[in-house]
Design a protein with these regions (language model features):
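Short, low-complexity N-terminal intrinsically disordered segments enriched in polar/charged residues
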Residues: 1-24, 28, 32, 73, ...
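Acidic-and-aromatic substrate-binding clefts and catalytic sites of carbohydrate-active enzymes
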Residues: 42-44
Length: 123
């Protein structure tokens, strides 16, 4: 996926793998004790993440990473996503690493828009 120790490249690799529906690469990037939190669920473990949160990326029309900031074992990534139906949103995710594996991701949702209008983001 990425050179060992380059956390920004590891994050880019995870996003590229997600967009390619490459679940095996994403699973390999996550630590065994991985935890995932969003406003809809807290401390979801790795098996539950793939059972309940993983979905085919065919709904995505365009996805752009806007910025990645790395500070030691922690990183933030902000991205803009446009769905094939025209809905768009910006999210920020907080990553924690254990070596070169991601041990935690906390997702912070931004607003969603469609046709220039603010819409409530569905789960």
């Amino acid at each position: 996926m990425a050179a060992a120790g380059n956390r920004a490249e590891i994050i880019r690799g995870i996003f590229a793998a997600y967009l390619a529906n490459d679940r095996a690469s994403v699973e390999a990037a996550f630590a065994e004790d991985f935890r995932f939190s969003t406003p809809y669920g807290e401390n979801i473990d790795k098996p539950r993440y793939f059972a309940e949160c993983w979905r085919d990326s065919g709904w995505i029309g365009r996805h752009e990473i806007e910025r990645i900031m790395v500070d030691g074992v922690e990183a933030y990534v902000t991205y803009h996503c446009v769905a094939r139906d025209g809905k768009s949103f910006r999210n920020t995710e907080f990553f924690v690493f254990d070596g070169d594996k991601v041990s935690r991701i906390d997702v912070y949702f931004g607003p969603s828009h469609q046709d220039g209008e603010l819409v409530r983001q569905d789960r």
